[in-house]
From Swiss-Prot:
The keyword Cell cycle applies. GO terms for cellular component: cell division site; cytoplasm. NCBIfam families: PRK05287.1-1. This is Cell division protein ZapD. InterPro entries: ZapD (IPR009777), ZapD_C (IPR027462), ZapD_sf (IPR036268). Belongs to the ZapD family. Cell division factor that enhances FtsZ-ring assembly. Directly interacts with FtsZ and promotes bundling of FtsZ protofilaments, with a reduction in FtsZ GTPase activity. It comes from the Bacteria.
Length: 250
């Protein structure tokens, strides 16, 4: 895709539940982006991501919320099977995927507990808020660990990541279903502003051309939302009187 036609999708939650899910998803993406830890800088980047993930996780009962939502979605899809002109094979496949994800999540140990109880993570986490607080004399355990064979660190990293797979798979299945519940529609904003109403919307998705160098600021809730478009260059950038973009309310 050329730079002229490449697009950016901005997502905005319309309730606190979705806000929490998106933050956890973002943390999981960061954690899984690490293929190896081979330096102090990569180690600190990983441990900061772990620390943020633990904090987000501690703000709610994520397992109970996800299991409840997965069950709700399965029941709704079961009703679809009785509708005419529905692709029963696809719907049944989605139901099975949600069911398997829910089963794995319900059987998994307490989410994130293996991270909270890990000695290295605990030691580093305590020092992250201190500027320059992870020198070798501050955390000699980390210094030793970073000088062990790469295979040892990779094995540990894999263990940390795999312990989150039940949560990751369940969340991915749910968010994919939500994102696919509505299609993008072309609309126009006037003088950099757009507003609309929705019935029980959970997630707002806004698609803009990257070349426009414009981003949205969203305010709203499940029934109504407003979007203000702003230029990346706050001093010299401008917003056209009519701005075409695409929107999806899931």
């Amino acid at each position: 895709m050329s730079e002229e036609t490449s697009t950016i999708i901005f997502e905005h939650p319309l309730n606190e539940k979705m806000r929490s899910w998106l933050r956890i998803e973002n943390s999981l993406i960061q954690l899984n982006s690490f293929q190896s830890i081979n330096s102090l800088s990569s180690a600190l980047s990983f441990f900061r991501a772990v620390s943020e993930f633990i904090e987000v996780l501690d703000r709610g009962e994520i397992r109970a919320e996800l299991l409840k939502e997965l069950e709700k979605r399965q029941k709704k899809l079961q009703q679809w099977l009785s509708f005419p002109n529905v692709d029963k094979e696809i719907v049944s496949h989605i139901i099975n995927e949600l069911s398997e994800s829910a089963c794995a999540l319900s059987k998994a140990p307490r989410i994130g507990q293996h991270l909270k109880q890990d000695k290295i993570i605990s030691l580093v986490k305590q020092r992250l808020s201190i500027p320059g607080g992870c020198c070798s004399f501050d955390v000699p355990t980390l210094h030793l660990w970073l000088n062990l064979p790469q295979t040892v660190r990779t094995e540990k990293l894999t263990c940390w990541q795999e312990g989150l797979y039940p949560l990751q798979n369940a969340l991915n299945a749910l968010l994919t279903l939500i994102r696919q519940s509505d299609t993008f529609k072309p609309v126009l904003s006037h003088n950099g502003f757009y507003q609309d109403s929705t019935e029980e919307g959970e997630l707002l998705r806004i698609k803009l051309l990257a070349s426009q160098q414009i981003y949205p600021q969203v305010s709203g809730h499940k029934n109504r939302y407003a979007i203000r478009f702003l230029p990346l260059d706050s001093e010299h950038g401008t917003i056209p009187s009519e701005l075409p973009f695409e929107i999806s309310c899931c």
